[in-house]
């Protein structure tokens, strides 16, 4: 099989994905790459909770997930957002399969802190064989981050950490975090590569601010012995052209600033 790329699309960028995003996917697929998409859906979940008058709150940046909130989260993530993405890829001639982390025990989860966060989970195991079977058949798995434990209890999982867990488990060559900007910007120019210490310095100096902070933190957290680099890319402009990825590469090794 060809090189495997995991792409994480946050809920906030899903509605802004441009035709060039899908053109990049088409080019990667045509070149024999294996593509896995992991998506979020925070804004959509928030809107649905409000519409259904289901109370919710955030604790340390994570949505406290009661049984009622979990039902809505699963409905939105697995039922709505996932299938919208499958349909979008189909429109662009790409064979996608939408799955939840519950399917085939894809994302086995355990509670992070049941008392404080409710049914918010962390990934303790990934069914890599299932993903590889889909990739071998040249499907593009689109994964919604709802997992379950061995007893079938479901959990809402942060999409960033789910994407990192999947990338590590299937030994992906690259993990891309899709944002609304073409990468980390410094004085209006893209920082093409940086190391963890450089990223931390840029945060301290106020070069990386706002919504980019959790994105780079998630990217850093995904780095491991098997995953040496991750990228911040744009969903609004081509992120892959002529065999080249465009964005900011974050790696463990020595980079530039």
Curated annotation (Swiss-Prot):
GO terms for biological process: arginine biosynthetic process via ornithine; L-arginine biosynthetic process. Keywords: Amino-acid biosynthesis, Arginine biosynthesis, ATP-binding, Cytoplasm, Kinase, Nucleotide-binding, Transferase. Pfam families: AA_kinase. Substrate binds at residues 41-42, 63, 156. Pathway: Amino-acid biosynthesis; L-arginine biosynthesis; N(2)-acetyl-L-ornithine from L-glutamate: step 2/4. It is found in: Cytoplasm. One of its GO terms (molecular function) is acetylglutamate kinase activity. HAMAP family: ArgB (MF_00082). Catalyzes the ATP-dependent phosphorylation of N-acetyl-L-glutamate. Belongs to the acetylglutamate kinase family. ArgB subfamily. PANTHER family: N-ACETYLGLUTAMATE SYNTHASE, N-ACETYLGLUTAMATE SYNTHASE, MITOCHONDRIAL. This is Acetylglutamate kinase. The gene is argB.
């Amino acid at each position: 099989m060809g090189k495997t790329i995991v792409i994480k699309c946050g809920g906030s960028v899903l509605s802004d994905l441009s035709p060039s995003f899908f053109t990049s996917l088409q080019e990667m697929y045509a070149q024999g790459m294996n593509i896995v998409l992991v998506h979020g859906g925070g804004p959509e979940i928030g809107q649905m909770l409000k519409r259904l008058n289901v109370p919710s709150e955030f604790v340390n940046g994570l949505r406290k997930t009661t049984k009622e909130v979990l039902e809505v989260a699963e409905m939105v993530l697995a039922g709505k957002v996932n299938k919208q993405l499958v349909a979008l890829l189909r429109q662009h001639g790409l064979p996608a399969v939408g799955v939840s982390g519950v399917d085939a025990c894809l994302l086995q989860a355990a509670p992070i802190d049941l008392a404080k966060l409710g049914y918010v989970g962390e990934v303790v195991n990934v069914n890599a064989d299932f993903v590889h079977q889909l990739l071998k058949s040249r499907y593009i798995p689109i994964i919604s981050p709802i997992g379950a434990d061995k007893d079938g209890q479901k959990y809402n999982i942060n999409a960033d950490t789910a994407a990192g867990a999947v990338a590590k488990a299937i030994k992906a060559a690259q993990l891309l975090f899709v944002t609304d900007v073409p990468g980390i910007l410094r004085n209006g120019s893209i920082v093409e590569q940086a190391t963890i210490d450089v990223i931390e310095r840029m945060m301290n100096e106020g070069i990386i601010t706002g919504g980019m902070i959790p994105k780079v933190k998630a990217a850093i957290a995904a780095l491991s012995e098997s995953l040496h680099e991750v990228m911040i890319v744009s969903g609004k402009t081509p992120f892959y052209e002529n065999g080249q990825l465009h964005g900011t590469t974050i790696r463990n090794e020595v980079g530039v600033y």
